[in-house]
């Protein structure tokens, strides 16, 4: 049991993605400040992506009603809009949910990598602004480390699971030094967007051609790449080492004759036909130096990778189940640490005062003798304090609030606030 932790969220699980925008915060920094000022939270972290808006909070007694009202005010919406979209968790459930996030289990695409980086950015922003403190910093740091370890040991995030990422990965596997190659993307639709995202993420330069230059320019403004004239491309495939073709054209854009001409003046080329129906003449594959792959082949590889990821889900859930009690003990121990630190500090201050008196009474005592006495008194204090402090930490890990409260009274420790 971990009192004082709360998570409130609107995600793709309980809201259409297109409707999530109304629950987002235009200024996350201002929202962090607003939640602390308006909902009674001592600490908070906001994880906001295209698929989720989540608030993690810590206080003595989190109040969901206050959080809901503050959220509505900060997002500029009526509280009634939450309806059944807003979901919440408390205590140990918060730990489990955050582990599911960092391990990729709660993502729309199971195992996707982006969420781990987004969680890291969220805690970094909260820490920098002072919105998070000892409890949430510890929670997020441990969840990020555990999520990374779970991903590495289970392979939940391995393999491409979009046509775009798989297509780019195949090119990387088949062509050396892709950064020095010229890449052309024909088309500006959904599949082209996936390809462009994957190319951009890996730092590759690429050109984009569409039916109109304006469409190519708009696509490149949003997704990266350099727009080129469609007509120039059709007459000059020879300028490219890699072609990604993803259009809805009802005819072959890339023909056998055009590629034959290209091969007379250059070496090999890799062509990925991601169109449906196909827009690359299959006879192109018979030409020496040409590597052609079509949408069906790539989609089958994506399906295989997705099946592999799903087969790892059980192992991930098992590891999360084992990690939750470990994290819960670590979080509970936080209640004991300031008491133990204060008790040790007070005991050492008393030791040093009495040591100074004793050394003064002894008079002309040598430096080495003084060090021996200093070491002796320090060892005595640490030995005397060690057992009760370890027992205090153990009681705290087990959630025994009575022992922690009793220790605070015995050592005259006053909690902040």
Swiss-Prot record:
GO terms for molecular function: glutamyl-tRNA reductase activity; NADP binding. The record marks 97 as: Important for activity. Pathway: Porphyrin-containing compound metabolism; protoporphyrin-IX biosynthesis; 5-aminolevulinate from L-glutamyl-tRNA(Glu): step 1/2. Keywords: NADP, Oxidoreductase, Porphyrin biosynthesis. Signal peptide: none annotated. The keyword Oxidoreductase applies. It catalyses: (S)-4-amino-5-oxopentanoate + tRNA(Glu) + NADP(+) = L-glutamyl-tRNA(Glu) + NADPH + H(+). Its EC number is 1.2.1.70. NADP(+) binds at residues 187-192. The active site is at residue 50. Substrate binds at residues 49-52, 107, 112-114, 118. Catalyzes the NADPH-dependent reduction of glutamyl-tRNA(Glu) to glutamate 1-semialdehyde (GSA). PANTHER family: GLUTAMYL-TRNA REDUCTASE (PTHR43013:SF1). Homodimer. During catalysis, the active site Cys acts as a nucleophile attacking the alpha-carbonyl group of tRNA-bound glutamate with the formation of a thioester intermediate between enzyme and glutamate, and the concomitant release of tRNA(Glu). The thioester intermediate is finally reduced by direct hydride transfer from NADPH, to form the product GSA. This is Glutamyl-tRNA reductase.
């Amino acid at each position: 049991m971990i009192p004082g932790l709360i998570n409130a969220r609107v995600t793709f699980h309980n809201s259409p993605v297109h409707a999530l925008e109304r629950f987002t915060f235009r200024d996350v920094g201002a929202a962090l400040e607003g939640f602390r000022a308006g909902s009674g939270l001592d600490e908070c972290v906001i994880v906001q992506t295209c698929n989720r808006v989540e608030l993690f909070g810590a206080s003595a007694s989190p109040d969901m009603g206050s959080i809901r009202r503050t959220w509505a005010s900060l997002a500029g919406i009526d509280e009634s809009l939450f309806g059944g979209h807003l979901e919440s968790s408390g205590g140990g459930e918060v730990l489990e949910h955050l582990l599911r996030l960092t391990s990729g289990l709660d993502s729309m695409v199971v195992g996707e990598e982006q969420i781990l980086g987004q969680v890291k950015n969220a805690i970094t922003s909260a820490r920098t602004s002072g919105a998070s403190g000892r409890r949430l910093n510890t929670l997020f740091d441990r969840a990020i480390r555990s999520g990374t370890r779970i991903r590495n040991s289970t392979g939940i995030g391995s393999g491409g699971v979009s046509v775009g990422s798989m297509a780019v990965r195949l090119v990387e596997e088949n062509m050396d030094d892709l950064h020095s190659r010229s890449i052309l993307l024909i088309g500006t639709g959904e599949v082209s967007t996936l390809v462009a995202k994957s190319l951009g993420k890996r730092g590759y330069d690429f050109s984009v051609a569409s039916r109109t230059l304006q469409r190519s320019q708009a696509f490149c403004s949003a997704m990266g790449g350099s727009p080129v004239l469609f007509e120039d491309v059709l007459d000059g495939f020879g300028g490219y080492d890699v072609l990604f073709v993803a259009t809805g054209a009802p005819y072959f854009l890339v023909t056998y004759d055009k590629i034959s001409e290209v091969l007379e003046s250059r070496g090999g080329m890799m062509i990925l036909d991601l169109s449906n129906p196909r827009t690359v003449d299959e006879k192109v594959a018979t030409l020496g130096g040409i590597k052609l792959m079509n949408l069906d082949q790539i989609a089958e590889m994506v399906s295989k990778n997705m099946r592999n990821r799903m087969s790892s889900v059980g192992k991930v859930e098992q590891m999360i189940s084992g990690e939750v009690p470990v994290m819960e003990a670590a979080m509970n121990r936080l209640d004991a640490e300031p008491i133990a630190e204060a008790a040790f500090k007070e005991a050492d201050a008393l030791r040093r005062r009495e040591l100074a008196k004793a050394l003064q009474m002894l008079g002309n005592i040598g430096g080495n003798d003084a060090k021996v006495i200093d070491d002796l008194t320090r060892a005595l204090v640490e030995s005397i304090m060690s057992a009760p402090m370890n027992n205090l930490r153990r009681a705290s890990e087990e959630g025994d609030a009575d022992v922690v409260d009793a220790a605070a009274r015995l050592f005259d420790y006053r909690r902040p606030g």
